[in-house]
């Protein structure tokens, strides 16, 4: 769990914002949402494979767009 130290004369809102940012960087909320319900191993593999395919297609489209602009 992210820990922040409240600085002297620091407003509560600023400290809360820093805490939220550190939680977001650590990925706590996404982890909680992911673990909210049990996911079968086959469903997890399927989800991860779909994400990998999506990342690959996105990378390919970015590379193709770059090539078009260079010529």
Swiss-Prot record:
It comes from Pseudoalteromonas translucida (strain TAC 125). It comes from the Bacteria. One of its GO terms (cellular component) is ribosome. The gene is rpsU. One of its GO terms (biological process) is translation. This is Small ribosomal subunit protein bS21. Coiled coil: none annotated. Residues 45-59 have a biased composition (Basic residues). Keywords: Ribonucleoprotein, Ribosomal protein. Belongs to the bacterial ribosomal protein bS21 family. Residues 37-71 are annotated as: Disordered.
């Amino acid at each position: 769990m992210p820990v922040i130290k409240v600085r002297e004369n620091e407003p509560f809102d600023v400290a809360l914002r820093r805490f939220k940012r550190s939680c977001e960087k650590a990925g706590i909320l996404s982890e909680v949402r992911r673990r909210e319900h049990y996911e079968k191993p086959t469903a997890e593999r399927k989800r991860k494979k779909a994400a990998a395919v999506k990342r690959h297609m996105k990378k390919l489209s970015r590379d193709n767009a770059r090539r078009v602009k260079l010529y």
